[in-house]
Amino acid sequence: MINKDFKRRRDFLLNKIEDNSIVFLFSGLEKSRNNDVNYKFRQSSNFFYLTGINNPSMLLIITKISSRHSTTLVCDRPNDIDKIWHGQLPSKSSYKKEFEIQNVLYFDELNSLELNDAKNMYFEFADENRLNQFIENLNLSQPQSRYLKNNTSRSTKIDLSNLIFDMRRIKSKSEVSLIRHAAKISANAHINIMKSCKSGLKEYEVEADFI
Protein backbone atom coordinates (compact mmCIF):
# COMPACT_ATOMS: atom_id res chain seq x y z
CA MET A 1 0.00 0.00 0.00
CA ILE A 2 1.17 3.53 -0.69
CA ASN A 3 0.26 6.37 1.64
CA LYS A 4 -1.91 8.04 -0.98
CA ASP A 5 -4.28 5.08 -0.62
CA PHE A 6 -4.81 5.87 3.06
CA LYS A 7 -5.38 9.53 2.22
CA ARG A 8 -7.91 8.48 -0.42
CA ARG A 9 -9.77 6.39 2.17
CA ARG A 10 -9.94 9.30 4.62
CA ASP A 11 -11.29 11.54 1.86
CA PHE A 12 -13.89 8.91 0.98
CA LEU A 13 -14.97 8.70 4.63
CA LEU A 14 -15.18 12.48 4.78
CA ASN A 15 -17.64 12.41 1.88
CA LYS A 16 -19.70 9.68 3.55
CA ILE A 17 -20.28 11.39 6.90
CA GLU A 18 -22.95 14.01 7.35
CA ASP A 19 -22.17 17.72 7.49
CA ASN A 20 -21.50 19.25 10.91
CA SER A 21 -19.87 16.06 12.16
CA ILE A 22 -16.74 15.02 13.99
CA VAL A 23 -15.01 11.63 13.81
CA PHE A 24 -12.94 10.07 16.60
CA LEU A 25 -10.92 6.92 15.81
CA PHE A 26 -8.50 5.48 18.37
CA SER A 27 -5.47 3.34 17.60
CA GLY A 28 -4.73 0.14 19.47
CA LEU A 29 -3.15 0.13 22.93
CA GLU A 30 -0.12 -1.75 24.19
CA LYS A 31 -1.10 -4.54 26.58
CA SER A 32 1.03 -5.63 29.52
CA ARG A 33 2.00 -9.28 29.69
CA ASN A 34 3.92 -9.15 32.96
CA ASN A 35 5.96 -6.50 34.78
CA ASP A 36 7.56 -4.27 32.12
CA VAL A 37 7.03 -6.71 29.24
CA ASN A 38 4.18 -6.10 26.79
CA TYR A 39 2.53 -8.43 24.33
CA LYS A 40 3.44 -7.86 20.69
CA PHE A 41 1.49 -4.80 19.60
CA ARG A 42 -1.54 -5.35 17.38
CA GLN A 43 -2.88 -2.23 15.70
CA SER A 44 -6.60 -1.53 15.42
CA SER A 45 -7.56 -2.73 11.93
CA ASN A 46 -9.79 0.28 11.27
CA PHE A 47 -7.18 2.78 12.46
CA PHE A 48 -4.55 1.20 10.23
CA TYR A 49 -7.02 1.11 7.33
CA LEU A 50 -7.38 4.91 7.45
CA THR A 51 -3.82 5.91 8.40
CA GLY A 52 -1.27 3.18 7.64
CA ILE A 53 0.32 3.97 11.02
CA ASN A 54 1.33 1.06 13.25
CA ASN A 55 1.99 2.90 16.53
CA PRO A 56 -0.08 2.67 19.75
CA SER A 57 -1.92 5.31 21.78
CA MET A 58 -2.97 7.62 18.96
CA LEU A 59 -6.19 9.31 17.94
CA LEU A 60 -7.45 10.37 14.51
CA ILE A 61 -9.91 13.28 14.49
CA ILE A 62 -11.76 14.26 11.31
CA THR A 63 -14.07 17.27 11.32
CA LYS A 64 -16.61 18.33 8.72
CA ILE A 65 -18.11 21.60 9.91
CA SER A 66 -19.91 23.57 7.17
CA SER A 67 -17.32 24.07 4.43
CA ARG A 68 -14.34 23.49 6.75
CA HIS A 69 -12.74 20.05 6.69
CA SER A 70 -9.76 19.01 8.78
CA THR A 71 -7.85 15.87 9.72
CA THR A 72 -5.79 15.77 12.90
CA LEU A 73 -3.56 13.03 14.29
CA VAL A 74 -3.00 13.19 18.06
CA CYS A 75 -0.15 11.27 19.68
CA ASP A 76 1.91 11.11 22.86
CA ARG A 77 4.88 13.43 23.21
CA PRO A 78 8.08 11.32 22.88
CA ASN A 79 10.41 11.26 25.87
CA ASP A 80 13.92 9.98 26.58
CA ILE A 81 12.64 6.69 28.02
CA ASP A 82 10.66 6.00 24.84
CA LYS A 83 13.78 6.61 22.74
CA ILE A 84 15.80 4.14 24.83
CA TRP A 85 13.26 1.32 24.56
CA HIS A 86 11.62 1.97 21.18
CA GLY A 87 14.14 4.04 19.26
CA GLN A 88 13.52 7.39 17.62
CA LEU A 89 9.80 7.90 17.03
CA PRO A 90 8.54 9.91 14.04
CA SER A 91 8.29 13.66 14.56
CA LYS A 92 5.11 15.62 13.93
CA SER A 93 6.50 16.86 10.63
CA SER A 94 7.37 13.28 9.63
CA TYR A 95 3.80 12.12 10.26
CA LYS A 96 2.49 15.04 8.21
CA LYS A 97 4.76 14.41 5.26
CA GLU A 98 4.85 10.61 5.20
CA PHE A 99 1.16 9.96 5.88
CA GLU A 100 -0.28 13.14 4.30
CA ILE A 101 -2.10 14.18 7.46
CA GLN A 102 -3.14 17.80 7.70
CA ASN A 103 -2.47 18.44 11.40
CA VAL A 104 -0.42 16.56 14.00
CA LEU A 105 -0.58 17.44 17.69
CA TYR A 106 0.58 15.96 20.96
CA PHE A 107 -2.17 15.18 23.45
CA ASP A 108 -0.94 17.92 25.79
CA GLU A 109 -1.23 20.47 22.95
CA LEU A 110 -4.85 19.75 22.20
CA ASN A 111 -6.66 22.53 24.02
CA SER A 112 -9.67 22.99 21.77
CA LEU A 113 -12.02 21.01 19.61
CA GLU A 114 -14.31 22.37 16.92
CA LEU A 115 -17.48 20.97 18.44
CA ASN A 116 -19.62 24.10 18.47
CA ASP A 117 -21.59 23.01 15.41
CA ALA A 118 -20.92 19.26 15.58
CA LYS A 119 -24.36 17.72 15.57
CA ASN A 120 -23.02 14.21 14.96
CA MET A 121 -20.22 12.29 16.64
CA TYR A 122 -18.84 9.24 14.83
CA PHE A 123 -16.77 6.80 16.88
CA GLU A 124 -16.46 3.08 17.47
CA PHE A 125 -18.95 2.26 20.19
CA ALA A 126 -16.47 -0.23 21.67
CA ASP A 127 -14.23 2.78 22.45
CA GLU A 128 -16.89 4.90 24.16
CA ASN A 129 -15.10 4.75 27.53
CA ARG A 130 -11.82 5.83 25.91
CA LEU A 131 -13.58 8.74 24.20
CA ASN A 132 -15.23 9.87 27.43
CA GLN A 133 -11.89 9.68 29.25
CA PHE A 134 -10.19 11.61 26.45
CA ILE A 135 -12.75 14.43 26.64
CA GLU A 136 -12.50 14.43 30.43
CA ASN A 137 -8.71 14.85 30.26
CA LEU A 138 -8.65 17.65 27.68
CA ASN A 139 -6.64 20.64 28.80
CA LEU A 140 -9.56 23.08 28.67
CA SER A 141 -10.68 25.92 30.84
CA GLN A 142 -13.64 25.13 33.10
CA PRO A 143 -16.21 26.99 30.91
CA GLN A 144 -14.83 25.30 27.77
CA SER A 145 -14.90 21.89 29.43
CA ARG A 146 -18.46 22.36 30.66
CA TYR A 147 -19.60 23.53 27.22
CA LEU A 148 -17.86 20.63 25.49
CA LYS A 149 -19.46 18.04 27.76
CA ASN A 150 -22.91 19.57 27.34
CA ASN A 151 -22.54 19.73 23.56
CA THR A 152 -21.19 16.18 23.46
CA SER A 153 -24.19 14.87 25.36
CA ARG A 154 -26.53 16.53 22.83
CA SER A 155 -24.74 15.22 19.72
CA THR A 156 -26.11 12.25 17.80
CA LYS A 157 -23.83 9.25 18.38
CA ILE A 158 -23.12 7.13 15.28
CA ASP A 159 -21.08 3.91 15.23
CA LEU A 160 -18.11 4.56 12.95
CA SER A 161 -17.40 0.83 12.59
CA ASN A 162 -20.37 0.32 10.28
CA LEU A 163 -19.16 2.98 7.84
CA ILE A 164 -15.63 1.61 7.73
CA PHE A 165 -16.84 -1.98 7.37
CA ASP A 166 -18.82 -0.92 4.29
CA MET A 167 -15.69 0.72 2.87
CA ARG A 168 -13.53 -2.33 3.56
CA ARG A 169 -15.90 -4.64 1.70
CA ILE A 170 -14.91 -3.05 -1.62
CA LYS A 171 -11.25 -3.59 -2.49
CA SER A 172 -9.17 -1.22 -4.60
CA LYS A 173 -6.86 -2.49 -7.36
CA SER A 174 -3.83 -2.15 -5.08
CA GLU A 175 -5.59 -4.13 -2.33
CA VAL A 176 -6.56 -6.90 -4.75
CA SER A 177 -2.95 -7.04 -5.95
CA LEU A 178 -1.67 -7.37 -2.37
CA ILE A 179 -4.22 -10.08 -1.54
CA ARG A 180 -3.20 -12.06 -4.63
CA HIS A 181 0.48 -11.66 -3.72
CA ALA A 182 -0.15 -12.87 -0.15
CA ALA A 183 -2.23 -15.82 -1.41
CA LYS A 184 0.56 -16.79 -3.81
CA ILE A 185 3.14 -16.74 -1.01
CA SER A 186 0.88 -18.89 1.21
CA ALA A 187 0.14 -21.34 -1.61
CA ASN A 188 3.83 -21.76 -2.46
CA ALA A 189 4.66 -22.26 1.22
CA HIS A 190 2.07 -25.04 1.54
CA ILE A 191 3.30 -26.70 -1.66
CA ASN A 192 6.88 -26.68 -0.32
CA ILE A 193 5.68 -28.18 2.96
CA MET A 194 3.86 -30.99 1.15
CA LYS A 195 6.98 -31.71 -0.91
CA SER A 196 9.21 -31.88 2.17
CA CYS A 197 6.86 -34.00 4.31
CA LYS A 198 7.90 -37.60 4.85
CA SER A 199 7.36 -40.38 7.34
CA GLY A 200 9.00 -39.83 10.73
CA LEU A 201 9.17 -36.03 10.62
CA LYS A 202 8.02 -34.22 13.73
CA GLU A 203 5.65 -31.27 13.57
CA TYR A 204 8.29 -28.75 14.68
CA GLU A 205 10.57 -29.93 11.87
CA VAL A 206 7.85 -29.32 9.31
CA GLU A 207 7.12 -25.95 10.91
CA ALA A 208 10.81 -24.98 10.68
CA ASP A 209 10.69 -25.54 6.93
CA PHE A 210 7.51 -23.47 6.71
CA ILE A 211 9.08 -20.57 8.61
Per-region residue spans from a language model:
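Active-site pocket-lining segments that scaffold enzyme catalytic pockets across diverse folds
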Residues: 171-211
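A composition/biophysics-driven feature that prefers long, compositionally simple stretches
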Residues: 1-188
